[in-house]
Amino acid sequence: MVNDSISDMLTRLRNAICAQHKVVQVPLTNINKNILKVLQKEGYIKNFEILFERKSGYLLVSLKYNSLNQDKPCLSVLKKISRPGLRMYVRTKKIPKVLGGTGIAIISTSKGVMTGSIARNLGIGGEILCYIW
């Protein structure tokens, strides 16, 4: 059993990208599903689907690669910020811009999981889950 499902998912995605896999299997949790929805909406992954096997389920994520250079993935860096031992919370004014707006910060708010720019526009803060660029 994994204590931090977000770190596990990010590590699986990172390893699949390094190995240039087309798809990767990730454990099914609500937070993982919501993070993948944000990644799909932002164009970092193609899509994902929910599959059930016996009592447990998993997410099958289709990775997206650059259309010009098939070796270059759309996801290059996945950095976990908040962790179980040290949660990182921010107010609206302190939400960081990742790489000057090139990357995204994924934030868990009271309104759900969203990017940092959307949370900033809505005027709500939350827990910074990870940075992606």
UniProtKB/Swiss-Prot annotation:
Q: Where in the cell is it found?
A: Plastid, Chloroplast
GO BP of this protein: translation
> Its domain of life?
Eukaryota
Database matches in SUPFAM superfamilies = Ribosomal protein S8
> Taking the first listed entry, what is the main subcellular location of this protein, grouped into a coarse class?
plastid
Q: Which PROSITE patterns match?
A: RIBOSOMAL_S8
The record's keywords, sorted A to Z, are: Chloroplast, Plastid, Ribonucleoprotein, Ribosomal protein, RNA-binding, rRNA-binding
List cellular component terms (GO). Answer: chloroplast; ribonucleoprotein complex; ribosome
Q: Recall the GO molecular function terms of this protein's record.
A: rRNA binding; structural constituent of ribosome
Listed InterPro entries: Ribosomal_uS8, Ribosomal_uS8_CS, Ribosomal_uS8_sf
Question: Known Pfam families for this protein?
Answer: Ribosomal_S8 (PF00410)
The protein's matches in PANTHER family, at most eight in alphabetical order, are given as: 40S RIBOSOMAL PROTEIN S15A
Q: How does it assemble?
A: Part of the 30S ribosomal subunit.
Q: Which family does it belong to?
A: Belongs to the universal ribosomal protein uS8 family.
UniProt function note: One of the primary rRNA binding proteins, it binds directly to 16S rRNA central domain where it helps coordinate assembly of the platform of the 30S subunit.
Q: What is this protein called?
A: Small ribosomal subunit protein uS8c
Q: Which organism is it from?
A: Cyanidium caldarium
